[in-house]
Amino acid sequence: RGAARPGAQGRQAWRSWVTAKPIVPREQANRDIDQAISYYLSEDAEQAALGFIDAVEQAYAHLSLHPATGSPRYAHELNLPRLRCWPLARYPHLLFYVERPDHIDVWRVLHGQRDIPAWMQEPDDI
């Protein structure tokens, strides 16, 4: 009765058609992540720090498979045509990246309340 649903093997076969791009964070993005983790730990919020790490890993996994899903909102504001951002689940941070032909170039991971244009000062190699 009803249509058959794909099982684990069906999902794996489907995933083989999708090519994941490697995530390559810039040094500044890694520093942003380290600073956020340090902040949560300084507030005795170890679970929040661990959750933040999970949220970053989930964002990386998603963007690796679906890089075009990020918002181009700041691309227009900053006049950086290919810049996209993706919100971290359950955290007020945005992951800023550019899709390259062979990888995802992660620029920054910033708290959404920051002055994003001021924090996005990067070389013009987009």
Task: Give the role of each language-model region.
Residues 6-17, 88-126:
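Enriched for short, Lys/Arg-rich terminal
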Residues 2, 9-83, 117-126:
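Basic, Lys/Arg-enriched alpha-helical interface segments
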